């Protein structure tokens, strides 16, 4: 499993709009077919983490090449300022469950 993780730091006055946007954006991203599930989490200081889980690295690479430019442009149109993003790809080495 490969995780494509996006961290966002959002100005306080944009937090409600950001959350509403992400509730539409995440299903659109999942509809590309490259990811099998996603989660949205919030921490203190209007910091958010979105995790998109893919079956393999090829799926993440194809998403970045084929669909990310369009979805990122839409995000930038809605939030031209006030949201700082970082993106990372994580390779799952092992998982445990009780």
Regions of interest found by a model, annotated:
Residues 14-16, 58-60, 95:
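Residue-level signal for secondary-structure boundary sites
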Residues 14-37:
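Short amphipathic alpha-helical segments
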Residues 11-14, 72:
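Serine/threonine-rich low-complexity intrinsically disordered regions
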Residues 20-23, 62-73:
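Short amphipathic alpha-helices in soluble, non-transmembrane regions
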Residues 2-9, 37-68:
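Short, well-ordered beta-strand segments in beta-rich or mixed alpha/beta enzyme
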Residues 36-49, 74-98:
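Glycine-rich beta-strand-turn "strand-cap" elements at beta-sheet edges
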């Amino acid at each position: 499993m490969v995780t494509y993780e996006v961290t966002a730091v959002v100005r306080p006055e944009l937090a409600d709009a950001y959350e509403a946007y992400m509730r539409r954006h995440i299903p659109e991203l999942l509809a590309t077919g490259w990811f099998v599930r996603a989660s949205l989490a919030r921490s203190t200081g209007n910091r958010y983490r979105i995790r998109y889980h893919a079956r393999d690295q090829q799926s993440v690479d194809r998403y970045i090449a084929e669909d990310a430019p369009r979805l990122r442009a839409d995000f930038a149109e809605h939030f031209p300022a006030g949201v700082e993003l970082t993106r990372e790809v994580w390779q799952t080495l092992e998982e445990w469950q009780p």
